């Protein structure tokens, strides 16, 4: 699942910035990739996925899924989007559920 791959790649605070972004980029929507390029991985407060994903869907928008993961910094959410039915899922955002 794309959300699982993305959260594992995201939560690597010791990874050099360029490598971190290059490995994460294929899973990101273009708009989110612009923002993610400026994230400093050293500031990401988790490096372990403890459980998940717990998926939440929107009955009004089947091309939107939230995947929640428990990490060693609490719950984090990966927002997944699909352009159209059958298209690949891409990450539209990753963030702490506490924010």
PLM ranges: what are they?
Residues 1, 5, 9, 44-46, ...:
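Residue-level signal for well-ordered alpha-helical segments
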Residues 1-39:
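Core segments of small alpha/beta cavity-forming domains
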Residues 27, 44, 50, 84-86:
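General N-terminal targeting signals
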Residues 38-60:
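A short, amphipathic edge element
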Residues 56-99:
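Exposed beta-sheet edge and beta->alpha loop/turn motif
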């Amino acid at each position: 699942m794309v959300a699982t791959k993305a959260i594992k790649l995201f939560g690597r605070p010791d990874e050099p910035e360029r490598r971190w972004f290059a490995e994460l980029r294929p899973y990101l929507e273009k708009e989110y990739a612009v923002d993610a390029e400026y994230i400093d991985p050293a500031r990401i407060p988790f490096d372990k996925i403890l459980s998940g994903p717990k998926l939440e869907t929107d009955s009004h928008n089947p091309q939107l899924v939230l995947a929640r993961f428990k990490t060693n910094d609490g719950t984090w959410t990966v927002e997944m989007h699909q352009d159209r039915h059958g298209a690949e899922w891409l990450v539209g955002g990753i963030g702490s559920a506490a924010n």
